[in-house]
From Swiss-Prot:
Intracellular or extracellular location(s): Mitochondrion inner membrane
Protein name: MICOS complex subunit MIC60
Gene that produces this protein: MIC60
Topological region Mitochondrial intermembrane: 155-668
Presequence boundaries: 1-29
Parts of the chain that traverse the membrane: 134-154
Top-level division of the source organism's lineage: Eukaryota
Family in the record: Belongs to the MICOS complex subunit Mic60 family.
Taxon lineage: Eukaryota, Fungi, Dikarya, Ascomycota, Pezizomycotina
Length: 668
């Protein structure tokens, strides 16, 4: 089944792939079966609802898979290509046939005509719409940029100035969004601005209006204040307080009722005015100016923030909101005096609160100053006591240190003296014992000689054989003992000679030379001595592999190093090129000190180090150079390392020489 499903796709493959499929099919089918055998072995299957009628129908049926077409490059003829096996019929129930057929249809005839060539591949779709996509992306990007810019302009004042000044149409977009937001939050603001209070008029009477009469400028100012109150979003309104909105609604209802009553009074008085004559109604305009159509309203100014107290500021906001509501009302003249009095009382209360607050601040400031002075006095006293205690402790520690150091020095001196005296006494006693032994031996020898002569004279030579044998044994024992003493002395002398060879190799060399051979000779001569092994192990491998400089070379290198240190003596820790140049120029004009100097500057340290090197005290010179700081210490790092190696080698040689002397004294 897998092979039959792959067969239609072979037409789209290349000749190489087709050849591979053909070879694979040849491997899978070792022999070609005839169509009759195929038809007898496995019945053919047709789709549901179709039946085989003719051989042409079977040959042209698209549901029947055709064998793959051979490639033009293939050498296998089409007749030898095996056909794919037909699919098995599907049985719905046991014992039933497929589509009511009892006999399989005859197999299709096999023809030698090659199959038609495969259709050419469809052409690749042309890439188009690049300009259209570019325009769409550009429009979307511009829209998103403008939307983001407007949103940031509403959030940040700095970006608002930049966006409205440098971006085209940025100011119009921001204004449009702000206007829509304002209209959404205050839908009745424009209605209140355009509203005008107009008194009812009588349509049935003709009235001549003088030129200077009419609406006064104060009414316009009141309308302007109303407009400002309506457009000021920061003030308290219905969007900030629901209680004030209810109060405003009640005031509006009251004003509406009063307007209705006034209108009824005007309508009742209208018939009486119609009965009057025209001469009484029409008056000259220059004799008496008419009152304005709308009475002027004296608005009450809002309170200013007198105190920074949050409670007082909240009360001030409440009173200002109340004043704004009353100023917006048409009948605010009734509350003007009351509001003015309340405003004056509130201002006086604010001044009193400010005075009390100032007094409290002054009193607190005085208390703070007193507390600060007391704190400073206490802190100074505490610091003084701490300094005294610290000075006493330092003096006590210094005395204890000096006494302990003197005690340890005296103890070590006494110990060294005792050891030397004991070694001298042991050596003298050993010499005396040796002399006594030699005297005894001489006496014994003399006695033996006398006895031998006597025996010789008396008994002859045979009587002296036993004595001679005993004497020979004693002489051999004495010879062995003296040989060990001689070997020890010889080994000690060789060790001393090897140490002198190392020292001469280090002191007489003009350039640093390795002294591995000399050090190996010293180690072989003292192979069983742990002190000598420890001293040799303390020497750095770099020292005996590369050599160490001589004192003259150390002094010469120090003089070259001192010049560089003087150049870098004025550099800070994080110096740049300018600092290096300035330090180099300043080093040219610096005077070199001579003699002993007790200062801590770089020049004094260099002077003391040079004097110590001339005296041969390398240890103290290294300590002086190690006290440098900054770039000076960095430059002298290599020189200090060489001096340390020289001191390590020198100390090791001194230890080896001391151990050799002690071995000479310990010989019995």
């Amino acid at each position: 089944m897998l092979r039959s499903s792959i067969a239609p796709s072979r037409q789209l493959l290349s000749p190489t792939v087709s050849r591979q499929w053909l070879q694979a099919s040849r491997r899978c089918y070792s022999r070609v079966r005839s169509p009759a055998a195929v038809s007898k072995g496995i019945p053919a299957f047709t789709p549901r609802g179709h039946a085989f009628t003719t051989s042409a129908r079977l040959a042209n049926d698209p549901n029947i898979r055709s064998p793959p077409s051979p490639s033009s490059e293939s050498t296998i003829p089409p007749e030898s290509v095996p056909r794919p096996p037909p699919s098995h019929p599907i049985q719905t129930s046991p014992g039933s046939t497929i589509e009511g057929r009892t006999q399989p249809p005859p197999p299709p005839p096999v023809t030698n005509t090659p199959p038609p060539p495969p259709p050419p591949p469809p052409p690749a779709p042309k890439k188009g719409g690049r300009l259209r996509r570019l325009l769409i992306y550009l429009i979307l990007t511009t829209g998103l940029a403008y939307a983001g810019g407007v949103w940031l302009s509403l959030k940040s004042d700095n970006f608002h100035d930049f966006f409205t000044e440098y971006i085209p149409y940025g100011e119009e977009a921001v204004l449009y969004v702000e206007e829509q937001d304002f209209r959404r939050r205050f839908p009745n603001a424009t209605k209140q601005i355009s509203r005008r209070a107009v008194e009812p008029r009588d349509e049935g009477q003709n009235v001549t209006i003088p030129g200077k009469s009419g609406v006064s400028w104060r009414v316009s100012e009141g309308q302007k204040e109303t407009k400002e109150d309506g457009s000021d979003v920061s003030r308290r309104g219905k969007h900030m307080s629901a209680t004030e909105a209810n109060t405003a609604k009640e005031a509006t209802k009251t004003s509406t009722v009063e307007e209705t009553k006034a209108k009824k009074q005007v309508e009742s008085a209208a018939p009486t005015t119609e009965k009057k004559s025209a001469s009484e109604t029409v008056k000259p305009a220059l004799e008496e100016p008419r009152a304005p159509a709308i009475p002027t309203i004296d608005s009450v100014e809002p309170l200013s923030m007198l105190v920074d107290e949050p409670t007082v500021q909240e009360l001030t906001k409440i009173v200002n909101d109340l004043i704004a509501v009353i100023n917006a009302d048409e009948s605010s003249s009734r509350f003007t005096s009351t509001l003015s009095k309340a405003k004056a009382d509130f201002q006086r209360l604010g001044e009193q609160i400010a005075v009390l607050r100032q007094d409290a601040q002054d009193a607190a400031r005085v208390e703070i100053e007193n507390a600060r002075a007391e704190m400073e006095r206490t802190a100074n006293e505490l610091i003084r006591r701490i300094d005294e205690v610290r000075a006493e402790d330092a003096a006590q520690f210094r005395e204890e240190y000096e006494s302990e150091r003197e005690r340890l020095a005296n103890a070590y001196q006494e110990k060294i003296k005792t050891e030397l005296q004991r070694v001298q006494e042991v050596a003298e006693q050993r010499l005396r014992n040796e002399l006594v032994e030699q005297a005894i031996e001489l006496n014994r020898k003399f006695l033996s000689d006398v006895r031998s002569l006597v025996e010789k004279e008396r008994e002859g030579r045979l009587s002296k054989l036993s004595e001679l044998t005993a004497n020979v044994g004693e002489l051999e024992k004495l010879t062995a003992e003296w040989n060990s003493v001689v070997d020890t002395n010889l080994n000690t002398q060789q060790l001393q000679v090897a140490v002198d060879a190392v020292r001469s190799a280090l002191e007489n060399s003009d350039i640093p030379k390795p002294f591995i051979n000399e050090l190996v000779a010293v180690k072989e001569l003292a192979s069983d001595d742990q002190v000598v092994d420890a001293a040799i192990s303390s020497i750095s491998p770099v020292a005996y592999q590369r050599g160490i400089p001589s004192p003259a070379q150390i002094v010469e290198r120090f003089r070259r190093l001192a010049t560089e240190v003087r150049k870098a003596s004025l550099l800070p820790e994080n110096a740049g090129i300018a600092s290096h140049a300035a330090s180099y120029m300043a080093s040219k004009v610096m005077f070199k000190k001579q003699g002993s100097d007790d200062g801590d500057d770089v020049e004094s340290i260099l002077t003391r180090t040079e004097n110590l090197l001339e005296e041969g005290r390398l240890d103290e010179a290294a300590r002086e150079m190690n006290s440098l700081q900054g770039w000076s210490k960095i430059l002298s790092k290599d020189w200090l390392a060489d001096v340390r190696r020289v001191l390590e080698v020198k100390q090791a040689l001194e230890i080896i020489e001391t151990e050799a002397r002690l071995r000479c004294l310990q010989v019995e």
